[in-house]
């Protein structure tokens, strides 16, 4: 009897620990993170729900539709787990028209070359209830650290890297580079 009771107790404790871990990424934790972040000095909350804070001000141009942007980024979940990043020396290059993550697209249109922003992207502006594979569970708020290196109209024959954000949003595998044709 004692053995059975100990086994039941062990299972219950394991389930409690699993629930506690899930709570760190659950709806309550995501909502609390958004509410707390909105109170931080310098945080701007847009009507869409996107939150951003300017960490460094640049003075270059803003991206226009169709531009090729180069950026450095780190993406974390609200519990601090890093889910994606560029390498420290090689920015991602992507066409603005291929950015399908609404929160990132909205922020990039507001930024200037040289800006470094912290973005807090609510789930509705990120990957929603579907999440993105094993890295991003469903209904997650994402925290970006983004530096916009450059924004320029595409040049004929210019090749840019695969847009990691469109790959995630479309749920397909990376398909190589994108070439701009006149």
Segment roles from a protein language model:
Residues 2-9, 18-182:
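Cross-family detector of peptidyl-prolyl cis-trans isomerase
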């Amino acid at each position: 009897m004692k053995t059975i009771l100990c086994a039941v107790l062990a299972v219950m404790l394991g389930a409690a620990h699993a629930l506690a871990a899930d709570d760190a990424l659950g709806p309550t934790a995501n909502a609390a993170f958004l509410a707390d972040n909105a109170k931080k000095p310098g945080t701007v909350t847009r009507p869409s729900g996107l939150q951003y804070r300017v960490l460094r001000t640049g003075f270059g141009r803003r991206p226009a539709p169709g531009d090729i942007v180069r950026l450095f980024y780190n993406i974390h979940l609200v519990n601090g787990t890093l889910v994606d990043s560029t390498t420290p020396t090689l920015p991602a290059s992507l066409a603005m028209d291929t950015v399908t993550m609404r929160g990132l697209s909205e922020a990039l249109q507001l930024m200037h070359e040289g800006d470094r922003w912290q973005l807090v992207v609510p789930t509705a502006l990120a990957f929603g209830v579907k999440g993105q594979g094993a890295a991003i569970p469903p209904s997650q708020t994402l925290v970006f650290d983004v530096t916009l290196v450059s924004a320029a109209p595409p040049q004929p024959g210019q090749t840019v890297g695969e847009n990691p954000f469109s790959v995630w949003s479309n749920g397909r595998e990376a398909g190589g580079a994108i070439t701009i044709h006149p």
